[in-house]
Amino acid sequence: MSEIDLEDLPGVGATTAEKLREAGYGTVESVATATTSDLAEAAEIGEATAKKVILAARKMADIGGFKTGRDILDKRKDIKKLRTLVPEFDELVGGGLETQAITEVYGEFGSGKSQLVHQMAVNAQLPEELGGLGGGVIYVDTENTFRPERIEQMLNGLPEEAEIGEIEEVLERIHVARAHSSDHQMLLLETARELANDLRTSDYPVRLFVIDSLTSLFRSEYAGRGTLAPRQQKLNRHMHDLLKLIDDHNAVGLVTNQVMSNPGILFGDPTKPIGGNIVGHTATFRLYLRKSKGGKRVARLVDSPNLPEGEAAFMVEQAGLKPC
């Protein structure tokens, strides 16, 4: 990450830099990936000035141009994996959930989506050698599903060698915000950026961003086909804001999604996730969870840029996610 201060950018003085930081643009990289209109509004400057600042930031941060495949390979060496600690599940997703990528988990009610994100909120705090990321968590809760009691049960269910502190310490590293509308949900990502920047040099920098659930508020507020276009535009921006966040902090993006039935499918599973192509194209990995016999859950890897489709079974127990 760049060590350049915002004040080093041409046209950005102390006052403008402070306004940018308050709006969530705490790094040169975040300025470089901003839109002209957003930056102009945040810093209260003209769009022409904002454009110059963005171009300068892109040059100083060395982003925005073409890179060779080898450059991309070198960058991918920074990627970490967050494990579920269920061997079959981890094998399915290539060793764990990748940082700098959004993993979407969708399924019907009771399929285990919120159980998975609670488990990841615990596992993220484990040291890397034990499958974690040694970091904290930002958790945007849109359905009032976060339960600290569940975190405690999962903490107690970790392997004996996994020591990350008492429950109070673990909960202190999970920063939860309840979203009440789609606009509030989008605003919370801006607040999350500020918080993550503040924690960047702490013992537990943010390494996991959770949105549970991604689409529920958008779906309830934008009902009917006539509102589909504005809903998708907002959802698209929201997803890309999350992408910028996880890229800037080398973190995992983990979102849950609701489903609907597709009556046009006569054979096979008619269940499909909400959000259409916007969510489908922005999420790097897509996991479909469903209930199975004997209390089992099945995770199916539906989409990945580098992994084959496949399935893994697991159990949701009081102690957390466990192998079958």
UniProtKB/Swiss-Prot annotation:
SMART domains, A to Z: AAA (SM00382), HhH1 (SM00278)
Keywords: ATP-binding, DNA damage, DNA recombination, DNA-binding, Nucleotide-binding
GO biological process, one term: DNA repair
One matching Pfam family: HHH_5
SUPFAM superfamilies the record matches: P-loop containing nucleoside triphosphate hydrolases, Rad51 N-terminal domain-like
Transmembrane segments: none
Matches recorded under InterPro entries: AAA+_ATPase, DNA_recomb/repair_Rad51_C, DNA_recomb/repair_RadA, DNA_recomb/repair_RecA-like, DNA_repair_Rad51/TF_NusA_a-hlx, Hlx-hairpin-Hlx_DNA-bd_motif, P-loop_NTPase, RecA_ATP-bd
Binding site for ATP: G107, E108, F109, G110, S111, G112, K113, S114
GO molecular-function terms, A-Z: ATP binding; ATP hydrolysis activity; ATP-dependent DNA damage sensor activity; damaged DNA binding
The protein's role, per its UniProt record: Involved in DNA repair and in homologous recombination. Binds and assemble on single-stranded DNA to form a nucleoprotein filament. Hydrolyzes ATP in a ssDNA-dependent manner and promotes DNA strand exchange between homologous DNA molecules.
Protein family membership: Belongs to the eukaryotic RecA-like protein family.
NCBIfam families to which the protein is assigned, alphabetical: PRK04301.1, recomb_radA
PANTHER family, sorted: MEIOTIC RECOMBINATION PROTEIN DMC1_LIM15 HOMOLOG (PTHR22942:SF30), RECA/RAD51/RADA DNA STRAND-PAIRING FAMILY MEMBER (PTHR22942)
Protein's name in the database: DNA repair and recombination protein RadA
